Amino acid sequence: MTLYKLVVLGDGGVGKTALTIQLCLNHFVETYDPTIEDSYRKQVVIDQQSCMLEVLDTAGQEEYTALRDQWIRDGEGFVLVYSITSRASFTRIQKFYNQIKMVKESAHSGSPSGASYLGSPMNAPSGPPLPVPVMLVGNKSDKAVERAVSAQEGQALAKDLGCEFVEASAKNCINVEKAFYDVVRMLRQQRQQQQGGRAQDRRPTGLGPMRDRDAGPEYPKTFRPDRARHRGGIKCVIL
């Protein structure tokens, strides 16, 4: 079964954990408990195709910037979250996006600091770098009376960044699946394009025999080698 690694990024308190748990465990978490790193797995069917999602819920605090580089290196697609009730969290989205771009470009250029796992479609050994699949999510759309960021501003930022946009409510389970599933759709399209390119050009790469991406690339068992700071381990939900 094909595995997709998604990473959720954004300021603390914007609802990253609430969105992730609503997607994977189908319930809403009322209490805010700052996350360092939690990983969840869920088997889903998207457009009549079964797949496994591995969703990494990350810390938004500034002191975890170094860890964030590792999370980004290991991720394939990204869900960037801000709260519509917080202009500061919206302003910080550009910083998170720039960090994604910097880390992925470093990985593609072959920098040791940007090395990622083998088989990542985002880090092909040759050719131009592929666009990084990103979904911008304005969470807490249920708090309309507290709105500090308009939907039009969110759409404009997404256009500037070249990514998709949706407003969502983890509390009311509105557009939660769309936020994650659309990233998977982008990843699928990229993998299909890469498979088509390899069918036309099968030159040796020095990395061993060609493999079918959708047959299951080789992934590490964890997002990062240091598990000491991992609070909850991998949560696995099989539907």
UniProtKB/Swiss-Prot annotation:
<dbReference type="InterPro" id="IPR020849">
    <property type="entry name" value="Small_GTPase_Ras-type"/>
</dbReference>
<dbReference type="Pfam" id="PF00071">
    <property type="entry name" value="Ras"/>
</dbReference>
<dbReference type="GO" id="GO:0007165">
    <property type="term" value="P:signal transduction"/>
</dbReference>
<dbReference type="InterPro" id="IPR001806">
    <property type="entry name" value="Small_GTPase"/>
</dbReference>
<keyword id="KW-0843">Virulence</keyword>
<keyword id="KW-0342">GTP-binding</keyword>
<dbReference type="GO" id="GO:0003924">
    <property type="term" value="F:GTPase activity"/>
</dbReference>
<feature type="binding site">
    <location>
        <begin position="13"/>
        <end position="18"/>
    </location>
    <ligand>
        <name>GTP</name>
    </ligand>
</feature>
<keyword id="KW-0547">Nucleotide-binding</keyword>
<dbReference type="GO" id="GO:0019003">
    <property type="term" value="F:GDP binding"/>
</dbReference>
<feature type="binding site">
    <location>
        <begin position="59"/>
        <end position="60"/>
    </location>
    <ligand>
        <name>GTP</name>
    </ligand>
</feature>
<dbReference type="GO" id="GO:0030448">
    <property type="term" value="P:hyphal growth"/>
</dbReference>
<comment type="subunit">
    <text>Interacts with mpkA.</text>
</comment>
<dbReference type="GO" id="GO:0005525">
    <property type="term" value="F:GTP binding"/>
</dbReference>
<protein>
    <recommendedName>
        <fullName>Ras-like protein B</fullName>
        <ecNumber>3.6.5.2</ecNumber>
    </recommendedName>
</protein>
<comment type="function">
    <text>Ras-like protein involved in the activation of Ras protein signal transduction. Ras proteins bind GDP/GTP and possess intrinsic GTPase activity. Plays a role in hyphal morphology and conidiophore development. Required for full virulence.</text>
</comment>
<feature type="short sequence motif" description="Effector region">
    <location>
        <begin position="32"/>
        <end position="40"/>
    </location>
</feature>
<feature type="binding site">
    <location>
        <begin position="29"/>
        <end position="35"/>
    </location>
    <ligand>
        <name>GTP</name>
    </ligand>
</feature>
<dbReference type="GO" id="GO:0005886">
    <property type="term" value="C:plasma membrane"/>
</dbReference>
<dbReference type="InterPro" id="IPR027417">
    <property type="entry name" value="P-loop_NTPase"/>
</dbReference>
<feature type="region of interest" description="Disordered">
    <location>
        <begin position="191"/>
        <end position="227"/>
    </location>
</feature>
<feature type="binding site">
    <location>
        <begin position="139"/>
        <end position="142"/>
    </location>
    <ligand>
        <name>GTP</name>
    </ligand>
</feature>
<keyword id="KW-0378">Hydrolase</keyword>
<feature type="compositionally biased region" description="Basic and acidic residues">
    <location>
        <begin position="199"/>
        <end position="226"/>
    </location>
</feature>
<feature type="binding site">
    <location>
        <begin position="169"/>
        <end position="171"/>
    </location>
    <ligand>
        <name>GTP</name>
    </ligand>
</feature>
<comment type="similarity">
    <text>Belongs to the small GTPase superfamily. Ras family.</text>
</comment>
<dbReference type="InterPro" id="IPR005225">
    <property type="entry name" value="Small_GTP-bd"/>
</dbReference>
